[in-house]
């Protein structure tokens, strides 16, 4: 069973994302309320997927994603955030984030995204978007 780590400062969001990951076939092996322990958790668990919020206490998720991918380029990261500024999205794309899922998201769509991101590593491409979609009804901005 593929494994996942959830990093989000909201306990409610961690619970919701955890349930969606389980529906997508993942086992949640660790959770954190900020990105400060991300490197340590990744090294300990080597998950198949990481979900990461951007706006959290301490380091922001975009910076943490860039740091993790610089050290572990094989890490698969999905950003789950309500922040849809083009500069943060571009930082995440340059860092190699696989997908940028905007909150609030449709649960069925999120499950689909988690499954597709895992399959993406098996050469099934995600769709490409030219513009950042509004955060409603299950929008995601995959890596180009």
Task: Name each model-derived stretch.
Residues 34, 60-64:
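Acidic catalytic/metal-coordinating carboxylates
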Residues 56:
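Receiver (REC) domain active-site loop signature in two-component systems and cognate sites
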Residues 11-30:
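Two-component/phosphorelay signaling modules centered on CheY-like receiver
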Residues 45-51:
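Active-site beta3 strand of CheY-like receiver
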Residues 112, 119-144:
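CheY-like receiver
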Residues 63, 84-101, 112:
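Alpha4 helix (beta4-alpha4-beta5 surface) of REC/receiver domains from two-component response regulators
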Residues 87, 105-118, 122:
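C-terminal output helix
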């Amino acid at each position: 069973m593929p494994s996942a780590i959830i990093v989000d400062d909201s306990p409610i969001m961690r619970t919701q994302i955890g349930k969606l990951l389980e529906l997508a076939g993942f086992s949640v092996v660790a959770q954190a309320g900020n990105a400060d322990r991300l490197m340590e958790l990744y090294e300990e668990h080597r998950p198949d997927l990481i979900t990461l919020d951007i706006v959290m206490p301490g380091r922001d998720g975009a910076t943490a994603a860039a740091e993790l991918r610089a050290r572990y380029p094989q890490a698969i990261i999905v950003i789950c955030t309500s922040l849809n500024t083009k500069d943060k999205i571009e930082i995440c794309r340059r860092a190699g984030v696989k997908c940028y899922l905007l909150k609030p998201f449709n649960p069925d769509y999120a499950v689909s995204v988690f499954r597709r991101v895992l399959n993406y590593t098996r050469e099934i491409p995600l769709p490409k978007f030219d513009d950042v979609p509004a955060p409603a009804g299950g929008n995601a901005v995959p890596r180009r």
